[in-house]
């Protein structure tokens, strides 16, 4: 989104970027983003949202509650396009309550093209799906009637939606076309600590939070990722987890280099002076567009659990 904004000059000044206060170190990240001159950030306190509103004029009442408690109001007429990565979030529900006509970004590289789309298919199989299509409640992952279109790495290959509901936005093509100035801008935002110039044979572990998904306890998750690292890590260990993963990986792996959670994993494709010998993840799309490792290992959750 930062790169998109940088390439689309706005006559009214920097583009607006809305950040959830739940993002780690939100204020510091916002300051670095603002310093680029490309975007101006707005921090929204999503945790203050009171929950789903029902009854007469529910969407108007829910929108007003969000604006009052979360600290931001959308002026839809002020923006040509509104983009969001997770329309299941509080902010996504607000956009639906505002009838905003948003564009859903592909959250991870090629995620609309994967074989496992159970979140969408399960949603469509629910008994209340038709009612929600008529605006009675919320729909996510691009199914909302207030979602204008869905971005995909290759819209022609996506079978989830009708062709007129899709648009191609290739992150691979974008990353391949970056100028040195654009790369430097991204590094200034997302690389906040010195990194080693050399890391021969390094392994990159890319965890995510299964605790947040209710699939295991924190202790179980810690034990699982320690077992994954013990099995697959060789050489120096680097860790880059998902922004919503609150695990303290520095405490779990004291000798590892722990990268910023807020950094998109794609940044690693060009920001380091070396490539990793191996990159390992568990039940994630994160390695699809990843080019900075000689070997990529994707484990299922079941495979990872068996290592403990």
What positions do the PLM features span?
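Active-site and donor-binding regions of nucleotide-sugar-utilizing enzymes
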Residues: 1-142, 270, 285-289
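A donor-sugar binding/catalytic signature common to diverse glycosyltransferases
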Residues: 91-93, 265-308
